Amino acid sequence: MKKVVLIGTGNVGVTVVYTMITKGIDAEYVLIDINTEFAKGHAMDMSDAIALNSTTGSKIRTGTYADAKGADLLIVAAGRPQKQGETRLEMIADNSKIMKDIALEIKKSGFNGFTIVISNPVDILATVFQKVTNFPKEKVMSSGTFLDTSRFRKFLSEKTGVPTNSVHGFVIGEHGDKSVVVFSRMQIGFSRLDDFLKSKALTEDDLKWISEKTYKEAYEIINRKRSTYFGIGASVAEMAESVLYNQRRIFPIGIYLDESKPGGGIYISRPAILGENGWEEVKNYDLSPAEQKAFDESAINLKKHWDDVQKEISF
């Protein structure tokens, strides 16, 4: 049976695990949190849900960092939550220190599996985790812009009437305000985006609205209910399933950007194949000149923040 370890049992982390369980991903789930009683309460609650599903062989319990040894997958959701009106990048100082401490403990445990970082800001924190542990880059990833892509597909579906599973395209770059919607590679059903523009089924104003709505939606949700967790829970469960069962599906997730590229040396989202060897970047995913410029600017902006982190924290 697979073994999955979750660090951080707040709303986001436990929603990921619960979604994995309801999807039928059989595993031994181990919950780790600084608040051990809180984690134990979640384990007890979810074990009741497991008991109602006679087809699953899953088990769930609490544990310590030592339990990471032998695990197939580590999901890191620890960190302070995003405050109302706060950008993800404004959380860097606090959560980078937390991530460094976690990474040191995980390295000490002998863990040798795959890691999905979902604590915000995910791009920077995945970089912190990989630098501290020195784990193979392809075995560390972040949830990146997978959720942004889901939101974008939802809004494009609303505008066109085409179901979301027939809307194909990605959001790349920073998981945040400088994300980049790749309209040039978009396909809606069997048609290119240009066909919808030519027929006036979509307008340039529609595309602008979709782009803005995609990155602003998180703030709207946080203003209403203080945090987001169902969307990211579903997204990360999909990633976990692809890694654990070698499905080799393509997702827009945080992967390492080579130092030779503008803003390189950090994790940032591009399309990647996820399977038993970790992530593989999708090759020949060409962008329009404007999209490439926006992506480079997004990477350079993140790199500046990463440089600031390195001034505050020794690696």
Swiss-Prot record:
GO BP of this protein: glycolytic process; lactate metabolic process
Presence of keyword Iron-sulfur: no
GO terms of molecular function: L-lactate dehydrogenase activity
EC annotation from Swiss-Prot or TrEMBL: 1.1.1.27
Protein's cellular compartments: Cytoplasm
Pathway: Fermentation; pyruvate fermentation to lactate; (S)-lactate from pyruvate: step 1/1
Residues binding NAD(+): 12, 33, 65, 118-120, 143
Keyword terms of this UniProt record: Allosteric enzyme, Cytoplasm, NAD, Oxidoreductase, Phosphoprotein
GO cellular component: cytoplasm
Binding site for substrate: 82, 88, 120-123, 148-151, 228
Primary location group: cytoplasm
Top-level taxonomic group: Bacteria
Primary enzyme class: oxidoreductase
Pfam families: Ldh_1_C (PF02866), Ldh_1_N (PF00056)
NCBIfam families assigned: L-LDH-NAD (TIGR01771)
Protein family per UniProt: Belongs to the LDH/MDH superfamily. LDH family.
Protein name as it appears in the record: L-lactate dehydrogenase
Annotated organism of origin: Mycoplasmopsis pulmonis (strain UAB CTIP) (Mycoplasma pulmonis)
Gene behind this protein: ldh
